[in-house]
Amino acid sequence: FRYSQSVRDAIRYIHDNYNRDISLNEVARYIYRSPEYLSRLFKSETGEKFSSYLMSYRLNKARDMLINTDMKIYEIAYAVGYTTPSYFSKMYRDFMGVGPEVTRSQRNTRSMEGYMSK
């Protein structure tokens, strides 16, 4: 499916700015559309609400950081745009089904298994 230019621009803006506090209003202003119009268009083309897409993108980025970096969980929370690490942990747990510490420990377990099998 091919997204409209407005939705492509909104998605690009999210990908470029997910690490800070952004809103539908801000993105709508950036692409010269009303928030109501962007909200409807985004949902109709992507199947997701703007806020759900933003949250999903942030939490998937966080998962990648938990797996691929040694950053502390609170650092990752800030790096993906959350201002409160405890809220980040709650949202991560709700979205991923496990807490960020579990994702991190699974990575550590996998890397040890690889090391021990050599």
Where on the chain are the PLM-derived regions?
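Hydrophobic, helix-rich cores of sensory/ligand-binding and other regulatory modules
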Residues: F1-Y3
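Terminal helix-turn-helix DNA-binding modules in bacterial transcription factors
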Residues: I11-R12, S44-T83, S105-K118
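Basic/polar phosphate-binding segments, predominantly the helix-turn-helix DNA-binding elements
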Residues: Y13, D21-Y57, A77-G99
